[in-house]
Amino acid sequence: MGFWILAILTILMYSTAAKFSKQSWGLENEALIVRCPRQGKPSYTVDWYYSQTNKSIPTQERNRVFASGQLLKFLPAAVADSGIYTCIVRSPTFNRTGYANVTIYKKQSDCNVPDYLMYSTVSGSEKNSKIYCPTIDLYNWTAPLEWFKNCQALQGSRYRAHKSFLVIDNVMTEDAGDYTCKFIHNENGANYSVTATRSFTVKDEQGFSLFPVIGAPAQNEIKEVEIGKNANLTCSACFGKGTQFLAAVLWQLNGTKITDFGEPRIQQEEGQNQSFSNGLACLDMVLRIADVKEEDLLLQYDCLALNLHGLRRHTVRLSRKNPIDHHSIYCIIAVCSVFLMLINVLVIILKMFWIEATLLWRDIAKPYKTRNDGKLYDAYVVYPRNYKSSTDGASRVEHFVHQILPDVLENKCGYTLCIYGRDMLPGEDVVTAVETNIRKSRRHIFILTPQITHNKEFAYEQEVALHCALIQNDAKVILIEMEALSELDMLQAEALQDSLQHLMKVQGTIKWREDHIANKRSLNSKFWKHVRYQMPVPSKIPRKASSLTPLAAQKQ
């Protein structure tokens, strides 16, 4: 009797000790934090002792091994730290004792992690594949949390690392293996690495069956068919996950099996087609109706799905599909085609006669426009002086600038030009006057000839005018080419300023050819249309037009 009592007491003592004892392990040179198996309020005092020597564990954080309340910290751990540690939770009314069995192992030279270093195995499936990092909640760590499988870093969009766990999308059997999490523990500014490994297994979700769910057709669906054409009806139903037994789909006509209905035109396919929808096993059955007739519209078509849970029925009826009015469609297409053709023709015509249309619109809508932009002139003419004189003693360029240009633009169109030599006051500083007049002009007309590359006055006016147009965006430039620069000297155009060359390439030039213009002062010529198009809207009535009124009065 005494022997049995002793045995029972021994078992109770062992089970009690085991209940309040915890196994912990780690690797050398890594951080290890152990929690006391006996829990208590945060205000309770917890004393730690090394059981073999009954020596108290210090609480000073400068020590490599120190106690911090319910936690025992090894920063870092050493193999010699292995042993049993005692923690005593002290309260005003009781004391509770717990034991922590700590084992520190040497780091493995190879990639294999022995079983005694593995944490509990977790399993996952296609819908649940979380792998938690063991004991991470005990540490003061920050992201990132690194994950490895069989010592290989995980890569790919299938692996998603969350705060303390790993999620694997579309889990497969090949995903089973040993997964290691690695993070950094921070203690008073010092960093210590921590690793933990656990196995992950993939399990197949158990199959299940459910009451049939018909995906198609919808209940009381009306399907439109064309008389004389073939029609197909599909009955599709799902029965659960995994292999399904005693599941079937079929069609009935007016409550009768297809084979018993006796209409050879209406037949269902031999066998059932298996498919999967959202992981569920489904069966499909197609009913084929050849040469649809009027009497087929009066029949009731039933899609039946049945298994061990029961029978579900969806009813379908046929209706005549309104014939397509091809004549109306052809008319609509024809009208749209004609409309698009007209638009294209109008666009082409407008593009061809855009300048004429713009000038006509100016004459009709706003023939004259007063501006308060601080400008005095509509255009400043930049041209080379001292040009080679013709046989009659007058320069062709100066004749064009001083005679033809003012006669057309000022007398016939109502513009105000500023021309060097004509609009300069006697005794006025030339440089100041040129710069002021250029800035007070809305357009800058450049007369381009081979002479411009050797003319200093032209170079200065060109620089000021281009600065206003390109840098200050205060005016626009009109380029008139009196002689093709490439005809006399291929290097002439290359000698121009880069900005002027850029304008010539971007907007082009208006070419004046005396030999090609019959009436040099006709507003209907192509040359003057392009010049007027690039000029602003006139601000006053042309001189010749305004002089007609007093002349007419005198005749009366």
Curated annotation (Swiss-Prot):
Gene3D superfamilies in the cross-refs: Immunoglobulins (2.60.40.10), Toll/interleukin-1 receptor homology (TIR) domain (3.40.50.10140)
Pfam family, one: I-set
Disulfide bridges in this chain: 36-87, 111-151, 133-181, 235-303, 238-282
Keywords linked to the UniProt accession: Cell membrane, Disulfide bond, Glycoprotein, Hydrolase, Immunoglobulin domain, Isopeptide bond, Membrane, NAD, Receptor, Repeat, Secreted, Signal, Transmembrane, Transmembrane helix, Ubl conjugation
Membrane protein topology class: Single-pass type I membrane protein
Keyword Cytoplasm: no
UniProt-listed Enzyme Commission number(s): 3.2.2.6
UniProt KW ATP-binding keyword: no
Expressing tissues: Highly expressed in kidney, lung, placenta, stomach, skeletal muscle, colon and small intestine. Isoform A is prevalently expressed in the lung, testis, placenta, stomach and colon. Isoform B is more abundant in the brain, kidney and the liver. Isoform C is not detected in brain, heart, liver, kidney and skeletal muscle. Expressed on T-cells in fibrotic liver; at protein level. Overexpressed in fibrotic and cirrhotic liver.
Signal peptide span: 1-18
Top-level enzyme category: hydrolase
Family, similarity comment: Belongs to the interleukin-1 receptor family.
Oligomeric form and interacting partners: Interacts with MYD88, IRAK1, IRAK4, and TRAF6. Bound to its ligand IL-33, interacts with IL1RAP to form the minimal interleukin-33 signaling complex with a 1:1:1 stoichiometry. Interacts with KIT (bound to KITLG/SCF). A mast cell-specific KITLG/SCF-induced interleukin-33 signaling complex contains IL1RL1, IL1RAP, KIT and MYD88. Interacts with TMED1.
UniProt free text on domains: The TIR domain mediates NAD(+) hydrolase (NADase) activity. Self-association of TIR domains is required for NADase activity.
Name by which UniProt lists this protein: Interleukin-1 receptor-like 1
Protein species of origin: Homo sapiens (Human)
